[in-house]
């Protein structure tokens, strides 16, 4: 078996490990460089290494920027559009939880947060910057278009197939680490509004 993400101890298997920590670090660093310090991180359950890594990248970027990590701004929800939309309506409508930016662990979650913000009359990116993860096709369909972490999907797919073929042939293979990651900056992020 070949797994995508996570280092699983399963006999006769290997994993393609993704740069999840580095990707979330890039996303959060982009927001801090725009002047944001109150950044909400909406992620998946920490029981999975992929999401632990993404939370770790977020906290690393905050710490490097001299921003105190606020655990109340690190939330775990189901990573779906609907769950993020419902959470976003509730969270963003509470004035005491004022944030200027949101980083999410996937694009559907970012889209749900964007829709909630827009329904509450919060302007994206003028009042709230939003960054997703995975850079799926949906990032080009939102209004504004969604800034998102880009993992090289073709390279990942190629490595998965190569590893599977080697395993089928009986070869013992090490895990493959994908190190390429970038941030596709689109229209959903802007400098913090200091008004």
Model features per residue range: what roles?
Residues 1-3, 13-15, 41, 74, ...:
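Conserved beta-strand scaffold positions in the cores of enzyme catalytic domains, especially
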Residues 14-41, 56, 60, 81-91, ...:
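Hydrophobic alpha-helical segments within soluble ligand-binding/sensing domains
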Residues 27-65, 72, 176-190:
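An alpha-beta-alpha
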